[in-house]
Amino acid sequence: MESVLACFQAARAARSPVIVQSAWSEMEPQMITYADLAGLIRCFGARFAEVPFAIHLDHGMSEEECMGALAGGFSSIMYDGSAGSYEDNVTVTRRLRRAAGAGGTLEAEVGRVGGAEGGGGDFEIVKSDPEQLRDFLEKTGADAIAVSIGNFHGSHGVHKGAPKLDFELLARLHDVCGVPLVLHGASGIPEADVRRAVTMGICKVNYYTQLYNVYMDCVRDNCGETMEECMGRATRVLAGEIEKLMDMCGSAGKA
C-alpha cells in the first residue's frame, strides 16, 4: 500500500502520469490477488483524480499469470517469454494480444534482459536483434517492446559494473519499431544515459532496485520509531525519489 501511495503522491507533485506495476512473484508471497492490487490502485486513483494511471503486470512469466491479471482488472500486462523459444514467445504473445482486446495494452520482450529479476540468479543477457524485432511485431501486434541493449535487472554490483547501454543498437531497434520501447533494469544506469535513451525511443522506464533500496534504508534508519511514524517517513522518502525519476525520464508536467 505504501509504495502505491508514494507513486500517486509523486505523480501529483510532478504533474506526471504514472504506471503502477507489480509482478506475481512480488504479490504471491504477500497473499495479494490481482483483484486486490487493482482495487487498491483504483482507490488511490480516485483520491488522486488528476493523475492519469495504468495498472500493469510486470514480467508475467506464463499465459496463466497474464490472463489472471486481465481478469483481475489490470489495464496492461507484460508477457515475458524471453526464457523460452522465439516461436513460443510469438505464439503466446499473439494469443495474449487478442485476449487484451482493444482496451488493454500488451508489452513483450525481444532478446533477453537477464539479471537478478525477482531474486533469481539467471544473469544471461541476449541483446535484441532488429530483424527479429521487426518479424515479432508483424506476427504478434504487441503494443510495446522491452529491449535488451546492455541493461539488466538487479544490483549492478552483482555484475561488477554499471550497465553500458548500446545506443547504436537502440537506434537500429527504434528504426524498425513503430511501438514504444521499454527499458527494464534502469537502477544503476547513469542519469545521462537514461535521458539519452528517452530521446531515442524509450517511452517506459522500469525502476525497482533503486526504489526498494531507498525505502528499506529509510525503514532501517527509523525502526526505533513507532510503526506508523517509520512507514510514513519511508513513504515520503520514496515519493520524493520517484518524483526525481519522473523529472529525469521526462514525464513531469505531462499530466
Residue ranges and their predicted role:
Residues 1-26, 34-50, 59-177, 191-207, ...:
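Alpha/beta enzyme core
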Residues 29, 33, 88, 125, ...:
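Catalytic cores of large soluble enzymes that bind and process phosphate-bearing ligands
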Residues 180:
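Active-site-adjacent substrate-binding region
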Residues 183-187:
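Glycine-rich beta-strand-to-loop/alpha-helix junction loops that act as flexible
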Residues 211-212, 241:
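Short, highly charged low-complexity linear segments
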Residues 219-255:
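Extended, intrinsically disordered, low-complexity segments
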